[in-house]
Amino acid sequence: RSVMCFHRADGKLLWQRDIIYKEKEPTHGTNPFCSASPVTDGEVVVVSHGSAGLVGYDFEGKQLWHYDVGKLEHVWGNASSPILHGDLCIHWAGPGPRQYLIAVNKRTGAKVW
């Protein structure tokens, strides 16, 4: 699982960050692991990597935080994109046996609710 940053003028790769998740995670043919979109508000970049966690980066690609969401198990895999609102990163995961709606601080990854 990776997040990549490209230069908007020439398309050159500026940086790439990978997350390792060793367990097999279900996904669907029409919903691959890249279905969840990264989000930015001009201050941070946040990516949902499914069971590998929710991760915040700065614009240089430095990992600011990692939030462990636990193992997600549903036939369609991960497709929920995070939302940034004020100082919060809001994220929902489901359906499946383990569903959640959380908010973490977008700069630190600390759980707010």
Label the model's feature ranges.
Residues R1-W113:
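Noncatalytic, solvent-exposed loop/strand surfaces
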